[in-house]
From Swiss-Prot:
It comes from Oenococcus oeni (strain ATCC BAA-331 / PSU-1). The lineage of its organism: Bacteria, Bacillati, Bacillota, Bacilli, Lactobacillales. PANTHER family: SERINE HYDROXYMETHYLTRANSFERASE (PTHR11680), SERINE HYDROXYMETHYLTRANSFERASE 1 (PTHR11680:SF35). Belongs to the SHMT family. It comes from the Bacteria. Keywords: Amino-acid biosynthesis, Cytoplasm, One-carbon metabolism, Pyridoxal phosphate, Transferase. InterPro entries: PyrdxlP-dep_Trfase, PyrdxlP-dep_Trfase_major, PyrdxlP-dep_Trfase_small, Ser_HO-MeTrfase, Ser_HO-MeTrfase-like, SHMT-like_dom. GO terms for cellular component: cytosol. Its EC number is 2.1.2.1. SUPFAM superfamilies: PLP-dependent transferases. It is an enzyme of class 2 (transferase). This is Serine hydroxymethyltransferase. CDD domains: SHMT. (6S)-5,6,7,8-tetrahydrofolate binds at residues 116, 120-122, 349-351. Pathway: One-carbon metabolism; tetrahydrofolate interconversion; Amino-acid biosynthesis; glycine biosynthesis; glycine from L-serine: step 1/1.
Length: 414
């Protein structure tokens, strides 16, 4: 394996992470396990090449094979989402969002995106992000009672604020997003509509969540999460916007693309186009619903909005007496990985929070199904109830290892 060529200190870190991924229950909603093909592409000699520009129009020679790989990624992305244009060069989802803003806005323009506490992303207008520093930003929130998007309230806010760009999409919203409603709001105030599908891209590609294609002016996404590709970004749009988006990516904000990552995107998109990807994506949702339903029956925790329509949900921990950071650390100690998450109208710091976010893409990739989701829910509640009982926590960690030993690291059934 590659680690045999590494120096001892780095080899220890890599092998340690491999063991962690082998034995842990992975519930971080933004993580997944890529295939050997994706890892092979990302670890290939394409990392040696530099290729500023686009296929057929590079600023360096010797890019004939890089062009083939990038064109494969582009064409597969277009087929996957049914779009006429795709840019696969963004280094990350945040990069893609920055480049989308550059393509459609000027510094100081107004943007309207989802509030962080409601499940939005930093790059949707948070004050600590470039999006809140370069642009005049406001945030819309979920309804305080239902914890769902209130499209009438968003329309009212948009009419008052008059944004140049409205952002739909989230990083911790478990319900179906009505992109047609957002299109109608954008049209009402003469704004561009950007949709960030980073979390639900795989579900959209599989036809299991409504698509923003044909409604959004520009679509951004990551290529990992539910797409099960390498960490990276991508922009989708109508061909009429190609020139302005291409210019915003290069030379507007990036130099050369990461050619090995672009090739890994192509490998992942090939897998996503296979019939079993829909089966896999459907199982992600089944698993999330099963676990959310089980948590909903527990007296000490509450599922935000009452459930999920996608791959993730947020747990309100208020009644447990523990905060999000404490539960994240507690579960880390028994080899269950997730992340602390703010609740709607959160009172605590983002470093603490009152909730945790749970996602099922990674465990679904390993082959776990509904029965295992019930076991995981039980393990989490056992840990919360035994948070100060070291002997019980040791038993829980052993049970986690026993469960994951049934699902080897490279046994991806999909």
């Amino acid at each position: 394996m590659t680690k045999n060529f590494l120096d001892p200190q780095l080899a220890k870190a890599v092998s340690g992470e491999e063991e962690r991924q082998r034995h842990n229950i992975e519930l971080v909603a933004s993580e997944n396990f890529v295939s050997k093909a994706v890892r092979q592409a990302q670890g290939s000699v394409l990392t040696n090449k530099y290729s500023e520009g686009y296929p057929g129009k590079r600023y360096y020679g010797g890019n004939e094979y890089i062009d083939i790989a990038e064109n494969l990624a582009i064409e597969r992305a277009k087929e996957l989402f049914g779009v006429s244009y795709a840019n696969v060069q963004p280094h990350s989802g945040s990069s893609a969002n920055f480049e989308a803003y550059m393509a459609f806005l000027h510094p100081g323009d107004k943007i309207l995106g989802m509030n962080l506490d409601s499940g939005g992303h930093l790059t949707h207008g948070a004050s600590v992000s470039f999006s809140g520093k370069m642009y005049e930003a406001q945030s819309y929130k979920v309804d305080s009672e239902t914890e769902l998007l209130d499209y009438d309230a968003i329309l009212k806010q948009a009419k008052e604020f008059k944004p140049n760009l409205i952002i739909a999409g989230a990083s911790a919203y478990s319900r179906t997003i009505d992109f047609q409603a957002f299109r109608d709001i954008a049209d009402e105030v003469n704004a561009y509509l950007m949709v960030d599908i980073a979390h639900i891209a795989g579900l959209i590609a599989a036809g299991l969540h409504p698509s923003p294609v044909g409604l959004a002016d520009i679509i951004t996404t990551t290529t990992h999460k539910t797409l099960r590709g390498p960490c990276g970004g991508m922009i989708l749009a109508d061909e009429k916007y190609a020139k302005r988006i291409n210019s915003a990516v290069f030379p507007g904000s990036q130099g050369g693309p990461l050619d090995h990552v672009v090739a890994a995107k192509a490998a992942a998109f090939y897998e996503d186009l296979q019939p079993d990807f829909k089966t896999y994506s459907a199982q992600i949702i089944k698993n999330a619903k099963t676990m959310a339903d089980a948590f909903s029956k527990e007296p000490d925790v509450r599922v935000v909005s009452g459930g999920t329509d996608n791959h993730m949900f947020t747990l309100d921990l208020t009644k447990t007496g523990l905060n999000g950071r404490q539960v994240q650390d507690l579960l880390d100690s028994v080899s269950i990985t997730l992340n602390r998450e703010a609740l709607p109208n959160e009172k605590r710091s983002p470093f603490v929070t009152s909730g945790v976010r749970i996602g099922t893409p990674a465990m679904t990739t390993k082959g776990l199904k509904e029965n295992e989701m019930l076991q995981i829910e039980h393990l989490i509640m056992r840990a919360i109830h035994a948070h100060d009982d070291k002997n019980e926590l040791t038993k829980i960690k052993r049970d986690v290892f026993d469960l994951m030993d049934k699902f080897p690291f490279d046994s991806n059934p999909f």
